[in-house]
Amino acid sequence: MADDRKAALDAALKKIEKSYGKGSIMKLGEKIDQQISTIPSGSLALDVALGVGGYPRGRIIEVYGPESSGKTTVALHAIAEVQKNGGTAAFIDAEHALDPQYAQKLGVNIDELLLSQPDTGEQGLEIADALVSSGAVDIVVVDSVAALVPRAEIDGEMGDSHVGLQARLMSQALRKLSGSINKTKTIAIFINQIREKVGVMFGNPEITPGGRALKFYATIRLEVRRAEQLKQGTDIVGNRTKIKVVKNKVAPPFKIAEVDVMYGLGISQEGELLDMAVEKDIVDKSGAWYSYKEDRIGQGRENAKIYMANHPEMMAEVSALVRAAYGIGEEVAVPEDEKGQEELPLVEE
């Protein structure tokens, strides 16, 4: 009896593979690629918070938060990392607000970046689907879900009501996209805004536009919020930003990465490296002074950051120790053009 059942199952499996191709059905233990393949996020602190060393390939990621919190910056750093590793990136700019000069400063190769500025939400999502289905693009960023306006809304009058139209559009698109994203191992990052429900007395009134579909389909959801302003003297030079992993299907969620987002420069690698090195006792902090081995590297956090920026060899050494302490892969070597760069001035305390 058992042999008959096994023979029937084998026949069914062969029939399925013949109809839908090899790999369409298999035993879970036989799956070839069980190890999660990732790309770095561009932030060491965020790589640690994500739990797997970066963004998992073939998954959907949602990045949301208030205005000017650093959502697009987070996505552009991911694009820069993909390009550094020889991959192809696409940016669907539904907001029509991408600054190419800022993207370039973050390390994005704008000559190779595929850019689309769609007229309607349907057009933007169809372009995303075509790019993902090609299998030739490693990362697609949609900025933003809230700006994906359905065609009916654009063609209609200004005061017309279109209840649930955008939510239906996103639900339909994600049903179609999720399979091809997984099959082609493309990373899809959807940037989203936040809105507030009217009349909520208890609990969090904040919601994200585009319905619930994206929340369900996303493997990772990142909440990006400004914590405080960073100043040099009286000048505001950036923001201390908290990135909270509110959903994570590949590692434990609710971890927080704190980074410095500097105006015009993006995430400060020196700042996060310094904080992580202090946490793991690689760099010693005594009062206001920071020391590495026998050398004092700065009085105050800003001066220690500047010292690290001016000494890339030491920074690479600290980076290797921090990565080993957190169990993250090796960092790339320091570029030659950074070794001879002009030193930054220290900050007056």
UniProtKB/Swiss-Prot annotation:
Its main location: cytoplasm. It comes from the Bacteria. GO terms for molecular function: ATP binding; ATP hydrolysis activity; ATP-dependent DNA damage sensor activity; damaged DNA binding; single-stranded DNA binding. ATP binds at residues 65-72. Gene3D superfamilies: P-loop containing nucleotide triphosphate hydrolases (3.40.50.300). One of its GO terms (cellular component) is cytosol. One of its GO terms (biological process) is SOS response. It is found in: Cytoplasm. Keywords: ATP-binding, Cytoplasm, DNA damage, DNA recombination, DNA repair, DNA-binding, Nucleotide-binding, SOS response. Belongs to the RecA family. Can catalyze the hydrolysis of ATP in the presence of single-stranded DNA, the ATP-dependent uptake of single-stranded DNA by duplex DNA, and the ATP-dependent hybridization of homologous single-stranded DNAs. It interacts with LexA causing its activation and leading to its autocatalytic cleavage. This is Protein RecA. It comes from Enterococcus faecium. The lineage of its organism: Bacteria, Bacillati, Bacillota, Bacilli, Lactobacillales. The gene is recA.
